[in-house]
Amino acid sequence: MGFVDYIEKPELAERYRKVRKHFYLRESAYDVTSACQLRCEGCYYFQGDKYSMTDQRDPEAWRSFFVSEKERGITYVVLAGAEPAVVPKILRACYETIPLGSIASNGLKRIDPDVGYRLHLSVWGDSTGDPVYRKYANGRPGPNCLPAQLQNYKNDKRVIFVYTFNHENAAQLDEVLERVSDAGHKLSFNVFSQPSAGTSPLQIREMLNRTMEKMIEAMEEYPETVIYSYYNAEVHTDAKSLHHLFGCPYPRARLAEGTVPTGLSKTFRSYRTDLSYKESSNCCVPDTDCADCRHYAAGSAIVSSRFPMHVDSERKFRAWLDYVDTYLATWLIDYERGENLYTYNDFVAARQERRDSLLSGAREAAVL
């Protein structure tokens, strides 16, 4: 059986048509400011040399720049940096030029409601953990950001909270989920991925299985709140990184491998605050160690682009449909995620097959 056979099933055909409508999205990423109230442990912005650029602060210069990006074919923008909320005029200039996109924010400063982008509000832990992982710029323990986030964005449909798992905060999710759910918001997951410098103590490798269990527990306890799938949990907590499991379509990886750019690797750019970019850092999270990459933003492009790797069985195709459906619900306002097509039983079966394969490989190696 193959793809043509799979889409003869109504539920698979319907889901495929639903996600295919959004295949026109062509993204790039933009650091819009080097200013931030916080210094978070393992923050990717303050890695490498990009934070040392001189900021372009003129909103009209940004407006002209986004016009050129639109002409280049970009239809979706990811605005980040240090903290985008501190440059509201630049956000407005972008939104008025390219109206589809998202903003990564700590949520401490409200973004103008007229800027209709998806807002990804970062959460690093509960009321005890968040101040430990996120300090003020002067080094003092930071705030527990969640109360301020909930107050700033009450009843704001633009918002999705993104909880980043690290090596010690799985249990802290309970408090966060209860508060986010009570406020009527949605939440998705990220997995801490080591920066290239390899200096963060938050690396998660020894806690991947516990993280996966917590993800699934949350999905099943808060199905109306958590935007995630079993396949998301499977691939983002695998012992192998996304790069090792699927390869990577981003220009940074293609350049390192010396392969011919196609698709995303031809168009994606990661711009710095001075409107410059470098091929060697054209990636959604440029200063991540590829060998440890489990980042949710990276997966949105990596897994979604690997359609051919997911059509050799119906189960894999169902998993891929769930993943793309989840990614679209995470990154687009008003996109409603459907029911899981790749069930918990599918997830368990896939993990057992993986274990059996690894065991078989180990036995063969022992014989040799």
Task: Give the label of every model feature segment.
Residues 30, 34-37, 242, 277, ...:
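Processing junctions and N-termini across compartments
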Residues 39, 73, 115, 183-188, ...:
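Short loop/turn motifs at secondary-structure junctions
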Residues 48, 82, 124, 192, ...:
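Flexible loop residues that form catalytic
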Residues 92, 117, 121-278, 282, ...:
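Radical SAM enzyme [4Fe-4S]-AdoMet core and its adjacent flexible, acidic
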